[in-house]
């Protein structure tokens, strides 16, 4: 690989200016405040409750075993949700700081395979869907031709799920 070309590519990517997408920021913030599960956003784990204990738990071994299994499942779900919930909160904290800035840039790096990645891990153009949705180009440009629109439509259909691009009328 010609290193000057690689460096030029990285520098070009790093010149892209970003801003926080305010409507998406407000939506995610409201969902988090109201424990509303939307897409990949986790509910607040503190709102998850253990199943009620059966009235005959002391005398019915089968009921005790079943309740323990259900409670164990809830505890596991709480642990997984807590991890995701904390990650979303950290992303939102970054977005809160960045939303008051007129625009910002990402530093990028490349690995030994020459794949390019943004250095920040949480709020970046290559992280989770909700994180990417919080970002928008400061200076957007219209899509070029119908091929650009088709690629955009197919990507959106894939995110929606269960859509065969061969069946799309584009």
What do the predicted segments below correspond to?
Residues 1-170:
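Non-catalytic nucleic-acid-binding interfaces of large nucleic-acid enzymes and RNP effectors
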